[in-house]
Amino acid sequence: MSVMSWRYSALADRHRALGSNLEDWSGMGTTWTYEATSLAQGYEAIRTKAGLMDVSGLKKIHITGPHANALINSTTTRDVRKIYPGKSAYACMLDKRGKFVDDCILYRMGPNSWMVVHGSGAGQEMLQAEAVGRNVSMQFDDDLHDLSLQGPLAVDYLAKHVPGIRDLKYFHHMQTTLFGAPVMISRTGYTGERGYEIFCKYEDAPKVWDTILGEGKSMGIIPCAFTVLDWLRVESYLLFFPYDNSEMYPFENEAPGDTLWELGLDFTVSPGKVGFRGAEEHYRLKGKERFKIFGLLIDGTTAPDGGSDITHNGRKVGVVTCAMHSHLTNRTMAIARLSVDTAVQGTPLKISGKNVETTAIAHTITFDDPKKAKRNAVG
């Protein structure tokens, strides 16, 4: 059903015309589904051709000033000295307990200028709190829209309009023009494919959207709903706060809060980095995992609902957070929160949910392209 949101996409009318009621995500009406294209069609397009998504519900925050680097360095897990202008990095934010509160992409725009893009967690509030007493300017930018063109043909389409796009490396961005509009194109995404995020002004978003879909139709480029990302992220081990977290699946006797060791996100901490919020607790909690994010390879073709129980030898050992069945690979897969002792390749498991009871094995993730060859492809 349609809901009221306090943020508004310039493409809302386009989405409604495609049969979306627009569900609220992070304060913006977002395309959970389209009548015009199914989730299976969107998934197949992005894996085999290309799909275009409106992901403008992501929050964009500009941070500038003499203390901008220090603010980013103290708030996130990345060493900002290694991120030069034109480069970006995936990072996490922790609370003082060393527990995950949000993830983000850090875009370095200049020597003392950044753009932080995050989802529905408390990233903005953390940055605001850490900015107190620092010589920085913070601006929340909802005029800036984010159109994500993802899939193996995305680069072929953009190459017709953007000189040098084939040379843009993974986690790098460029300022350019597209259809006469000023844009920033970033080689990032949330699909496991080679893809690009196109940041443009509110007033230019409809033209960019319409032109890509109009010109790209002959290449198989179609509009894709936001929830297609759930199908893609399961295969590509991409977590989505709070849907894989203890905020959604609480501990019995503890407040919500997962460690990076439990989530498998400890790689986001730059080697040897200290001094960021929650750092001491983060390092202290290594080896004290209460669960592990792990994959499931599931028997049958029915994807269990999120929240389905997982048992091993009659003992509950976890919960499914997100599952999908791929008609391209004929595999049914899931992301799960598993007990540490069962988060081992090949452990036999049973799944009991409202929509299915079946068996599975614990399986390492990533399922699709574990070496990230597609994301790092050149040319």
Residue ranges and their predicted role:
Residues M1-A91, K99:
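Acidic, proline/glycine-enriched N-terminal capping motif
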